[in-house]
């Protein structure tokens, strides 16, 4: 199905939502795939990296992949269901739909290149900025700056508190390891859900605002297969 999209350049989607649902263009597909790659290959490692590293020896990569995929699919389809086909969780409400052009699709490509070179960039700011107006762009920039500031302060305060309470040199008791592992999986799952529900807009911006069910299946497959490659490579 994916090959058919690429060869034809566009595909008619059964919908009554207007022009944005009439066709998924080649540039929409390219932008979606590049944005999905950026999220899976780069951004998701920041969220799941510690969890993966601490569980690699105990669990097969297929088990970790299945767990991460389950949360991803639950987040994706829950958002699609409760928001009337909108997988961005309403984050694109202030960015009107527009037909995707080559320069829109170039944004996630530049993002991938920059992250591969080790340059710290904001995925949301770089990808969504090419679609947003100046007013929306200014609000995005302010929210990003405030978000980074709050995250930095909160992380530092929590780190100080944790280091005061826990002694790294003291090993965890055997009877407590299971509880700590369960807590790690639960908190990582919640963090993964929170991050996905926020950053899904970076991918959804290349798709119709109301995604039909057949396209949702394709989107789900792209994510799950992409995660499989990421976990297999470690």
Where would I find each of the regions flagged by the language model?
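Multi-pass alpha-helical transmembrane bundle typical of ion/small-solute transporters
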Residues: 1-234
């Amino acid at each position: 199905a994916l090959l058919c999209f690429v060869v034809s350049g566009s595909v008619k989607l059964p919908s009554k939502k207007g022009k944005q649902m009439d066709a998924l263009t080649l540039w929409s597909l390219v932008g979606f795939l590049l944005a999905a790659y950026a999220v899976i290959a780069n951004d998701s490692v920041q969220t799941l990296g510690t969890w993966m590293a601490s569980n690699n020896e105990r669990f097969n990569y297929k088990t970790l992949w299945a767990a991460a995929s389950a949360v991803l699919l639950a987040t994706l389809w829950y958002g699609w269901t409760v928001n009337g086909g909108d997988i961005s969780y309403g984050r694109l409400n202030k960015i009107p739909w527009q037909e995707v052009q080559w320069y829109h699709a170039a944004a996630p490509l530049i993002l991938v290149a920059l992250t591969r070179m080790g340059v710290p960039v904001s995925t949301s700011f770089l990808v969504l900025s090419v679609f947003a107006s100046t007013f929306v762009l200014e609000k995005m920039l302010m929210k990003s700056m405030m978000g980074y500031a709050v995250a930095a302060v909160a992380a530092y305060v929590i780190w100080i508190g944790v280091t005061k309470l826990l002694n790294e040199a003291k090993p965890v008791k055997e009877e407590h390891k299971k509880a700590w592992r369960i807590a790690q999986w639960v908190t990582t799952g919640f963090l993964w859900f929170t991050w996905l529900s926020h950053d899904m807009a970076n991918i959804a911006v290349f798709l119709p605002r109301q995604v039909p069910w057949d396209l949702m299946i394709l989107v789900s497959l792209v994510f799950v297969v992409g995660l499989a490659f990421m976990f297999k490579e470690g």
